[in-house]
Structures are given as structure tokens and as C-alpha cells.
Amino acid sequence: MKVRASVKKICDNCRLIRRRKRIMVVCSNPKHKQRQG
């Protein structure tokens, strides 16, 4: 899980979702997991 100020889709499988008022990226590739810090 990467914590970043700006979250972006890295590949086509990445999905932007909102969870508990946080923007997150979920993907089939675990390296692409991000959340906004």
C-alpha cells in the first residue's frame, strides 16, 4: 500500500474507489494499491 498525496491509475486494471472518505486505488496487481494520505 502506497500512501500518496495524489493517487492515479497506473494500469487499465486499476480502479479508483472511495472508502471512509479516502480515495483509494485497488488493482489486480498488488504493487498498484494506493491511498490518499
UniProtKB/Swiss-Prot annotation:
Record's GO cellular component terms: chloroplast; ribonucleoprotein complex; ribosome
InterPro entries in alphabetical order: Ribosomal_bL36, Ribosomal_bL36_sp
Subcellular compartments: Plastid, Chloroplast
GO MF term set: structural constituent of ribosome
Sorted UniProt keywords: Chloroplast, Plastid, Ribonucleoprotein, Ribosomal protein
UniProt keyword Iron present: no
GO-annotated biological processes: translation
Any Pfam family matching the protein: Ribosomal_L36
PROSITE patterns membership: RIBOSOMAL_L36
HAMAP family membership: Ribosomal_bL36 (MF_00251)
NCBIfam families: rpmJ_bact
Annotated family: Belongs to the bacterial ribosomal protein bL36 family.
Name of the molecule in the record: Large ribosomal subunit protein bL36c
Taxonomic classification: Eukaryota, Viridiplantae, Streptophyta, Embryophyta, Bryophyta
